[in-house]
Amino acid sequence: MKEITIALVGQPNVGKSSLINALSNAHLKVGNFAGVTVDKMEVGLIHKEHQITIIDLPGTYALNDFTTEEKVTKDFLEKGQYDLILNVVDSTNLERNLALSAQLLDTNKKMLLALNMWDEAQKEGIKINTEKLSKELGVVCVPTSARSKEDRLNTELLLDEIVRLYSQNTTNNENIKVPSQSFKESLKYSQSAQRIAQLVISENQQNASFEHTYKIDKILMHKRYGIFIFLGFMFIIFSLSFLIGGGVQKALETGFKFLSDGIKENVANEDLASLVGDGIIGGVGATVSFLPLIVVLYFGISLLETTGYMSRVAFLLDGILHKFGLHGKSFIPLITGFGCSVPAYMATRTLQNYNERLITLFVIGFMSCSARLPIYVLFVGSFFPSSSAGFVLFCIYILGAVVALVMAKLLKLSVFKGQTESFIMEMPKYRFPSWRMVYFSIYTKSLSYLKKAGTYILVGAILIWFMSQYPKSDAAMKAYKQESLLVNKDTTLSSEAKEEKLKELKTELDKKNLKNSIVGRGGAYLEKVFSPMDFDWRLSVSLVTGFMAKEVVVSTLGVLFSLGDQNEKSDAFRGILRKEVSVPSGIAFIVFVMFYIPCFAATITFGREAGGIKFVAYLFIFTTVVAYAFSLIAFYATQILV
């Protein structure tokens, strides 16, 4: 079977992801370029006995060295191993896209042109003469549409053309050199694009869609209440995630509890039963049960992104962000931080100003990622009535964003002083949501979450279980055996009373063994550090394990609080939390989780993006001080108010 490697190149917002998913019917696989923290996307498929690998390069307007995307794309085109270039252009904005196409043609590599969003161009009255365009460029041009299965156009034809072009014996396998554009060269490419566009676009009638966009923008982009509309959307998303996802979550909790109890009742070996029931199922199950809430959150944010609304919010907030030392482009990394800090850190590469980029990097962690959502849901459900849970959750996220702005201003005034840059960004058109893209977004992110639960969260839960079980206390075990013997010999007690008494003795033994374990001994020292907020050793230990992954906080608590009557765990041990943790401590714990250092993977990504290990040390100090200070304030404020 012959192998074909394709470099997929195009400007931002031309639908490359939609096209690549339509071609492959698969999900993109993420891989890192060596030494650069920018993602490339790879997908493989088989077509007519050819193994085709498509490499989706970062969206770029030109092959210069101005932005990281441009550098990465240019570097791959010069040094990467590929057979041909598939240039994706937006049919509704052909002239602007052809400037990049003209530059790609100068590489002398085999090339195809995909005229994407062809259906939208037709609706807008734009008619493109593809034969004339192919003649002018000297490459095959294929109209494509990939937003949905119903509207899919020419995907098979495009694959046929890829195979045909590859089969031609004109491959240039030598490394090429793409020179950076001077102003004169940029002007040449722009004039060439303008000339070709005028030749091939035979009709361009304005239609009602432009008027509709203008009317929608007058409302959503209003300079006074536009921000409140955005906050309203976010409030609805968070409320629905608690309302809809919460019901499914409780069903999952019940299922995991039933499974855990069944194993502990039917497995004879007590340690093995505890490992599987409390360690594996209790730890991993506590994490997996929060997936429905995360799915609803991803769904809401994906809808806002695919309609083109999120990019407009960046413009809407540019003035506010500049006042706090940030840039309008900072909004995209910040809002991405609600999903995961890793891609959020990577998204800062669009910021050209060094100081603004570092400020954004330092405050992204205050935007609560989806991994923290299970912790919030657990504690909000424990200390607040269900009727107000959605509002409290919304306030948590808003507070994180407000603190991020305040800290950004402090960093701007103290550490990262300098001039700000103006904001130039393409405004995409409003579009109906692509349900296929929304599905792919939710699917891939949910799958990533489940993979975490099945890998290092599982490992973390098992490690926490072992460290919480060993070493056993010989003295406690000896006392337990003696007292159990006395209870069994006591003829004055009924069988029910004996069973209850033995259960109390077992609970006491478990508590003593836990305090004598590795976790218990380490937690005793950590408890001193967090004593001002009255965190017990279990809460303290969970914060440390949370550095591995924030989801591990819930699984750690699930293991450490798995004592006593297991029937009390009906609501993901919320009842136990209410008994064991005071309201001020619970609120302080939420606040600390909001602001302390992100997970290990995110921290490593931060270090690469910021410029080295010293910045990781700065991040640890910065986030720890902020988290501790605000947690302390929350603790004493709650004590006064409650």
UniProtKB/Swiss-Prot annotation:
It comes from the Bacteria. Disruption phenotype: Cells are unable to colonize the gastric mucosa of mice. GTP 2 binds at G35, V36, T37, V38, D39. PROSITE patterns: G_FEOB (PS51711). CDD domains: FeoB (cd01879). GTP 1 binds at G10, Q11, P12, N13, V14, G15, K16, S17. Belongs to the TRAFAC class TrmE-Era-EngA-EngB-Septin-like GTPase superfamily. FeoB GTPase (TC 9.A.8) family. This is Fe(2+) transporter FeoB. It comes from Helicobacter pylori (strain ATCC 700392 / 26695).
